[in-house]
Amino acid sequence: MKRDDFILMVGTAAVGILIAFAAVLFSAWPLSYAQDQLVSLRGAGSTFAAPLYKKWIEEYAVSHRGVTITYDPVGSGEGVKRFLDGSVDFAGSDEVLSGTELTNIPGALMLPITAGMITIAYNIPGVNSEIKLPRDVYVDIFIRRIHKWDDPRIASANPGIAFPHRDIALVVRQDSSGTTAALTKHLTTISPGWRAAGMDVGKFIEWPSAVLSAPGNEGVAARIRLSEGSIGYVEYWFAQRLALRMAALENKAGNFITPTAHAGELALSSRVAQVQELAASVVDPSGTDAYPLVSYSWMLAHAQYADQVKATVLREFANWSLSDRGQGYGAQLGYLPLSADVLSIGRQALVN
């Protein structure tokens, strides 16, 4: 088994989380299955949510037998590709399906399974404190308009910190990534300069020259840890696990916000209050104390499966992952629990 594969034996239910565009289709799924039946489920996709999938599978295995779940953290883009070509039963993605993708696979279902913060992590020799990054500054770092750590715009936002006169090494994803999609949506929303500089939005974009790249959130975090003078974007759990420094980012209200669970939850609540659809993105939350860079992570599944036992297993695990216990494991890992409104809609759709 590859180190990054999460393969565990689980039982009377297993993975899935579905709903979104047509919850009523779940009513076609059978309600139960024989406890002695063996079921195998395959998933792939998001590295953003991979630690939570791993934790869920491990914990579910404690009290369940008979179902094998595999989840391969290959990135959202590759996970969606495998889902579309039928090589996996479900996929994890930090980006909703495009119109073209939905056309290619009618009846695809999506549901936010968790949410998390995208941090801007850095490794600056001699700087051991939290730095503040104004909105226009971190946009221009990613555009490569700001090249040195002692740039006056960085220094003026951080009085008292002696920045070294050295190049900024930008670390980005080399694979097709929902984390990249969420970041670039945010950057183009907060700054017209993003598009004006010829930058794109999506899971895979052409970055300016002279950047460092790595696969997956884990790879980006490791590259930042090993590269002095570097900065990059990475999901909170990965930055925390490697003890990376994380910047306080200026939010829409003009406040500098450290990535904390409370600040992330405020960001999600500002969006849920406005939109009730489960495929909503949070690109620039308006809360006074909201952390500005957050993303849902979705699970993709089919409305109907030829194997009805497999369909039942997916639905049953979906209920478990939406439970207080399932969401609690996410909180333990630094993810943001889904709001009561989103959980209620999801659970009701599964009942229907």
Which role fits each region the language model picked out?
Residues 5-12, 29-352:
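Flexible loop/hinge segments at secondary-structure junctions
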Residues 22, 26-30:
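Hydrophobic membrane-targeting alpha-helices
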Residues 12-23:
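Hydrophobic membrane-insertion alpha-helices, especially the h-region
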Residues 1-2:
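N-terminal hydrophobic targeting signals that begin at the initiator methionine
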